């Protein structure tokens, strides 16, 4: 029928009377006549661009009166990771989306709008530019901002992609429409929540802003509007959103402001549709709008209509059989199309009656744009190629460009009478979800690479997570240490946070020195000391910091004295008693020179009567007066610098475990002091698996993972030995309390264990299988994204951060 309609419309546009083909029903003839009347457009030509916009009034609460008795609302919804999800998760999303569609009855019209709109590149550049601060590092900030702009240019962040659902109902008045619209809105928000999709209702100003941006795609005109301006100016809301003009000079293109556009509809001819079709349309890197108008058909009417169709087909079948008998043919031989249609109609009837399917009428529209006619035609050709790839056709809306354009507005007002009947499952195949983006615009959002699926910048703020604790995992050469250094540098330049690094391989010295940080070299030959007995009044959230410090000293003594069985109960008792005694003296006059050292504990133990106290004192002796007395000194370095690195590379096997535990306690002291000052503390632990090897350091690490969040601490474990990490008894606690994981290339044995631990799909796992340097998966809360970080190698920061031996040597020689 629609082919006939197109021919009639084109051929007879200037004729007043059209003879309808006799085989069309009265309803079909009326439908054709309506479209032709619209196509003529010579009886109701709008006098202005404002008049062309087909709504009557926008209310501040977001309700729009489109016609005398038709009211609509718009919801903006975010994306979820459908394309990257496991097969069972994709099935679950699809089934939930089917239920979502089935919510709409025939009294609710709705429209899905997918808008890809170019935005001013300078706006994005402003978002990624790092503001200057009053320190010596603004040249580095400039360099880092330049790097971000270069990365931005590689992606298509200049294209803003948004998704909307607009729904509308018929009502006699605003008073009657409002409560029902609110009720539908609440149900829809709950349905989105079940899908795991974040959604928000647009108010009137936001809806106007959206239409303004759509009408001003090519000129980047700013939206300036306030409700209070209307009475004073005598203007209508349309004056604030309309372009300079609309022009429809040809039958298949239009001009809107300074931009060319073309409206097309998707002719669905494929027997089977793919869930990739909509995704491919939305992946086009040009300004465009994809719109789906969907109208649910009353179930009884749909069933009745199909039954009528079956009856008509049966009648035709009988006629064909009679014809066959008269002609002397076998009456069972009937046209194959007739048999196929009959079979399909019966299958459809069964679906509607017993398989929770509904019938929908779908109009699928695509608006392509271009700065020139040539660019427009190129974009239309690309969209047509996508349709043909899936055995469908993209047809231009000849003589209906204006109606098509206005049907793309988020008003749920369909002015195009080209509809395709589809069941729930067929309609749901246009799954409106592809891949989630992680581009946060807060001032503390940090750079983590480009989204491997969309090539857009990944910028996130770990502080926005419920649990900002993190892990950086990767095989040697995958970019693990570089990623940690990049985050450290970024955090130092962007935030006011303090940064502490536990560095077992002396890899971070150059970076720390670049930012005038403090490198504390802890080794038997060093003259830099940190005191494991350091304490401050904020050490515990309770009123008694000594009790928590005693717990740490017990862990320390466990490493020194414990052996396989650990400390005995009596030994724990005497240690606890002595700790309270020596700190009681300190808190009576808390000056630095009164801070206890290990020798004070050693002497206090010797003063006790129990033989167990003397046993512990004897074990401590080598760390107090012997050759391992490194930790029997008061702290003599600046541990309050914004950036502190504890270099423990030269600690021998005997001291390394103790050194790591002491560093952890120093960090805890810093975190507690910073919390009191309202400051966050980032703590990076390289070779993190070593901390989980020993029971005491593992238990302390788990405590850090559990308690840091409340105190403004953001710990990050970095390791290449994933097997050792995963073999720890504490690993479950670590993973359960980590909402941020930066996973680079993984060894074959580790991949499957991680997949089981983190519920990673085989497709997701492919991004950490034989992946290149700086490539992998980012876990941010519930979002999993593949990333690629091609950090420019010509920057000074790169030379400081690289761990490649040849590049490190070149940097030293330079």
Model-derived features: where do they sit?
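P-loop NTPase motor domains
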Residues: 80, 87-106, 113, 117, ...
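Hydrophobic anchor at the beta1->P-loop junction of P-loop NTPases
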Residues: 472
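A short helix-turn-beta junction within AAA+ P-loop NTPase domains corresponding to the substrate/partner-engaging
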Residues: 516-520, 730-743
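Conserved P-loop NTPase
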Residues: 758-813
């Amino acid at each position: 029928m629609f082919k006939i309609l197109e021919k009639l419309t084109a051929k007879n546009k200037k004729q007043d009377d059209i003879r309808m083909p006799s085989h069309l029903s009265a309803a079909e003839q009326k439908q054709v006549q309506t479209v032709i009347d619209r196509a003529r457009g010579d009886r109701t030509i709008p006098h202005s661009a404002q008049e062309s916009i087909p709504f009557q009034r926008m209310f501040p609460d977001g309700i729009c009166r489109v016609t005398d008795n038709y009211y609509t609302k718009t919801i903006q919804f975010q994306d979820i990771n459908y394309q990257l999800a496991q097969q069972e998760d994709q099935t679950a999303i699809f089934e939930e989306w089917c239920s979502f569609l089935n919510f709409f009855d025939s009294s609710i019209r709705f429209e899905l709008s997918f808008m890809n709109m170019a935005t001013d590149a300078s706006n994005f550049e402003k978002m990624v530019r790092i503001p200057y601060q009053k320190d010596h590092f603004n040249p580095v900030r400039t360099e880092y901002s330049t790097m971000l702009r270069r990365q931005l240019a590689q992606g298509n962040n200049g294209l803003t992609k948004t998704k909307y659902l607009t729904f509308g109902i018929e009502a006699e008045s605003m008073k009657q429409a409002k409560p029902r619209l609110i009720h539908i809105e609440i149900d829809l928000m709950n349905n989105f929540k079940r899908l795991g999709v974040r959604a928000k209702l647009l108010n009137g100003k936001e809806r106007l802003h959206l239409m303004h941006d759509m009408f001003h795609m090519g000129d980047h005109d700013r939206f300036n509007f306030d409700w209070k301006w209307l009475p004073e100016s005598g203007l209508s809301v349309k004056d604030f959103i309309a372009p300079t003009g609309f022009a429809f000079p040809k039958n298949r293109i239009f001009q809107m402001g300074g931009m060319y556009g073309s409206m097309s509809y998707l002719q669905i001819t494929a027997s089977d549709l793919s869930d990739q079709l909509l995704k491919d349309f939305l992946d086009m890197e040009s300004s465009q709008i994809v719109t789906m108008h969907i109208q649910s058909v009353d179930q009884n009417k749909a069933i009745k209509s199909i039954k009528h169709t079956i009856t008509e087909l049966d009648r035709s079948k009988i006629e064909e059989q009679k014809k066959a008998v008269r002609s002397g043919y076998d009456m069972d031989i009937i046209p194959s199309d007739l048999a196929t249609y009959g079979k399909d109609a019966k299958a459809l009837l069964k679906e509607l009656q017993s398989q929770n399917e509904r019938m929908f009428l779908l109009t699928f529209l695509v608006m392509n744009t271009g700065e020139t006619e040539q660019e427009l035609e190129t974009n239309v050709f690309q969209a047509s190629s996508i349709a043909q790839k899936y055995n469908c056709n993209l047809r231009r809306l000849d003589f209906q460009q204006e109606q098509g354009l206005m049907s793309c507005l988020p008003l749920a007002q369909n002015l195009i009478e080209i509809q395709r009947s589809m069941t729930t499952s067929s309609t749901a195949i246009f799954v409106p979800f592809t891949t989630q983006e992680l581009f946060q615009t807060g001032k503390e959002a940090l750079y983590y690479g480009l989204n491997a699926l969309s090539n857009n910048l990944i910028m996130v703020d770990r502080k926005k997570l419920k649990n900002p604790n993190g892990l950086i995992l990767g095989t040697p050469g995958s970019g693990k240490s570089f990623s940690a250094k990049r985050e450290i540098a970024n955090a130092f330049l962007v935030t006011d946070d303090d940064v502490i690094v536990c560095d077992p391989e002396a890899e971070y010295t150059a970076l720390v020195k670049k930012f005038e940080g403090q490198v504390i070299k802890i080794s038997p030959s060093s003259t830099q000391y940190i005191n494991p007995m350091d304490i401050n009044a904020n050490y515990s959230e309770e009123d008694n910091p000594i009790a928590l410090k005693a717990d740490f000293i017990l862990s320390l003594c466990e490493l020194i004295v414990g052996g396989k069985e650990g400390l005995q109960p009596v030994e724990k008792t005497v240690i606890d008693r002595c700790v309270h005694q020596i700190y009681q003296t300190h808190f009576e006059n808390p000056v630095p020179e009164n801070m206890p050292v290990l020798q004070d504990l050693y002497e206090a133990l010797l003063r006790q009567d129990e033989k167990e106290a003397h046993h512990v004192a004897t074990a401590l002796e080598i760390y107090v007066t012997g050759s391992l007395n490194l930790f029997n000194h008061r702290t003599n370095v600046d541990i309050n610098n914004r950036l502190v690195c504890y270099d423990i590379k030269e600690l021998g096997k005997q001291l390394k475990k103790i050194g790591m535990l002491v560093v952890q306690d120093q960090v805890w002291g810093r975190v507690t002091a910073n919390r009191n000052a309202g400051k966050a503390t980032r703590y990076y632990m390289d070779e993190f698996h070593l901390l989980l090897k020993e029971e005491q350091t593992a238990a302390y690490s788990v405590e850090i993972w559990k308690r840091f969040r409340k105190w403004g601490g953001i710990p990050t474990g970095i390791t290449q030995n994933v097997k050792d990490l995963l073999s720890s008894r504490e690993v479950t606690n670590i993973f359960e309390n980590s909402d941020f994981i930066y996973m680079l290339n993984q060894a074959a044995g580790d991949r499957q264990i991680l997949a089981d631990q983190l519920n990673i799909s085989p497709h997701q796992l492919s991004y950490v299988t034989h992946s290149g340097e700086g490539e992998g998966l980012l876990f941010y809360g519930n979002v999993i994204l593949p990333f690629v970080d091609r950090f420019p190698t010509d920057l000074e920061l790169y030379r400081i951060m690289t761990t490649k031996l040849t590049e490190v040597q070149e940097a030293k020689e330079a």
